Amino acid sequence: SVFDSNDIVNRGSASVDYGGAAIYNWKEGTLKVTNSNFTNNIKNYKNGDNLVGAITTIGNATVSGSNFVNNSGRWGGAISATGAELRKNSSTLTVSNTIFKDNSALYAGAVYIWGSNYNIADCVFDNNTAFGKGNMTPNNNNGGALVVSQVSRFNEPITGTISGSKFTNNKAQYGGAAYFNKGFVTITDSVFENNIATAEGGAVGFSHASVKDLVVSINNSSFVGNKAPVAGAIFTNVDSKITNSNFINNSAAKIGGAICNVNDLTVENSKFVNNTPQAIHNSKEL
């Protein structure tokens, strides 16, 4: 299937302020997208709307073998999964073998997840930005490729996995590639390379006022050539564990060439090479 240069279709009875330009999967729906291309689906949003560029899904959704190129919206330039809107059951977004390139939004350049469980496997996120188009300026432009936020409708923590995926050349204010502030997060066998944050977390930002609401595990992953003023690769203020991972040539203008940690951090069997000004800036004992 090909979805090219669309703007708000298949809304059903939903408000005009919601929905993707190509597909809108409502609360009771189940969406399956396979071997499809989404290109130039751009929502020129106005102040106060909640639109994304290509797909909005509230129900369960599976996306595989597809391409999202140059889509744009407010929350999630390519996909927005808003399971927190569900009244009866939690939802899950599953994405595999899919490419996200040149997408943009004010918040989450490619994929925005709000209260949905998620599984992202064998995907590529390249050159996505959380600075977007339009006339609305939020307080923070987070997650160049991905943002995960909010608990489920039932106030339960969401769970998510990212595996075998590559994040390259993405840019945002906080979390150049990805930003998380809710749930149990597991990242394995993934690469974060040449991502940029203009504030904190060149590759990834993990941040929440209540540390119990966000727990992080990273295993067998690489962070190479990422940059930010603070925390060249990872910024975290929550309970985090990193194992069997590599941090190479990451840089921060101020502190934390590879990692800036302000909570409980465990690092095991990992390699740090040529990170500047120092590998880890840590306010608590490792």
Q: What is the meaning of each model-derived region?
A:
Residues 131-132, 174:
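Alpha-solenoid ARM/HEAT helical repeat scaffolds used for protein-protein interactions
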Residues 77, 109, 176-177, 201-202, ...:
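The feature encodes a structural signal of leucine-rich repeats
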Residues 77, 133-134, 280:
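Short glycine/serine- and acidic-residue-enriched loop/turn motifs that recur at repeat junctions
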Residues 1-12, 16-43, 51-72, 80-104, ...:
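Surface-exposed loop/turn motifs in large extracellular/passenger domains
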